[in-house]
């Protein structure tokens, strides 16, 4: 049975002091969480140590928001798996739509990050998704297929999470209909060819739509942005019914 993974991506939010205050409020809210699910938070790099030093660390796992494909070198602004593992990081978000958009990150680069994350002992959360223009032109399936085939080449599906995040739904308040999201997640599972791969949905996930999203057969979790910044909101998402 696939375990549900509820992940919060804080992006460029939260200082160390704010993260500490957040955890103090959040952790009691998830202490009784079902054993069939895992909670993950991806804080800014500067706040990772706040998580790894927290006494109640057992209740959730840490993810980085990106990762490089080398352990060291002249790669300004990048971070390596070796550096992250020192701080108890277990996951790494790869290929999020924002690096794809703002830094022109390619499927080839995303693949290198994902493969190296796995070889270093981390589980990559590889993001895929179409733009509004691509969706309106009927190109969503073609785009997702390309991103999966090129971005996941030579990866181990047993140590992998794929997050379907339709770009037009991120931070816009627009949510992909649960049935439509489930169809894309089913497509991703078929493309990978491994029934037990964990597939998340991301895109304006909130407390008022989490129960419907998680009732879908091919959605195994969510990648949450803005709603993960409030401890009560994210706890409600983690404790979905």
UniProtKB/Swiss-Prot annotation:
One Pfam family it belongs to: TIM
Entry's localization field: Cytoplasm
Main location: cytoplasm
Disulfide bonds: none
E.C. number: 5.3.1.1
Active site (UniProt): 96 (electrophile), 165 (proton acceptor)
Pathway(s) served: Carbohydrate biosynthesis; gluconeogenesis; Carbohydrate degradation; glycolysis; D-glyceraldehyde 3-phosphate from glycerone phosphate: step 1/1
GO molecular function: triose-phosphate isomerase activity
Key words, A-Z: Cytoplasm, Gluconeogenesis, Glycolysis, Isomerase
PROSITE patterns: TIM_1, TIM_2
Catalyzed reactions per annotation: D-glyceraldehyde 3-phosphate = dihydroxyacetone phosphate
GO biological process, one term: glyceraldehyde-3-phosphate biosynthetic process
EC class (word): isomerase
Residue numbers binding substrate: 9-11, 171, 204, 225-226
GO cellular component: cytosol
Similarity remark: Belongs to the triosephosphate isomerase family.
Subunit structure: Homodimer.
Reported function: Involved in the gluconeogenesis. Catalyzes stereospecifically the conversion of dihydroxyacetone phosphate (DHAP) to D-glyceraldehyde-3-phosphate (G3P).
UniProt protein name: Triosephosphate isomerase
Source species: Prochlorococcus marinus (strain AS9601)
């Amino acid at each position: 049975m696939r375990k549900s993974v509820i992940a919060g991506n804080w992006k460029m939010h939260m200082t160390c002091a704010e993260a500490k205050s957040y955890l103090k409020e959040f952790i009691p809210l998830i202490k009784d969480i079902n054993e069939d699910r895992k909670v993950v938070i991806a804080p800014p790099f500067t706040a990772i140590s706040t998580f790894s030093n927290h006494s109640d660390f057992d209740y959730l796992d840490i993810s980085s928001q990106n990762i490089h494909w080398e352990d060291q070198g002249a790669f300004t602004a990048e971070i390596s798996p070796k550096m992250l593992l020192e701080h108890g990081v277990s996951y790494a978000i790869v290929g999020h739509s924002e690096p794809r958009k703002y830094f022109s990150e390619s499927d080839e680069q995303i693949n290198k990050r994902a493969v190296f994350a796995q070889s270093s002992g981390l589980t990559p959360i590889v993001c895929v998704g179409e733009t509004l223009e691509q969706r309106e032109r009927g190109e969503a399936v073609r785009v997702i297929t390309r991103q999966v085939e090129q971005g996941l080449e030579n990866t181990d599906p047993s140590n992998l999470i794929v997050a379907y995040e339709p770009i037009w739904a991120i931070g816009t308040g627009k949510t992909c209909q649960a049935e439509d999201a489930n169809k894309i997640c089913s497509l991703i599972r078929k493309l990978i060819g491994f029934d037990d791969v964990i597939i998340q949905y991301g895109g304006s996930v909130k407390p008022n739509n989490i129960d419907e999203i998680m009732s879908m057969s091919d959605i195994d979790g969510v990648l949450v942005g803005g709603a993960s910044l409030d401890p009560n909101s994210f706890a409600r998402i983690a404790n979905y019914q």
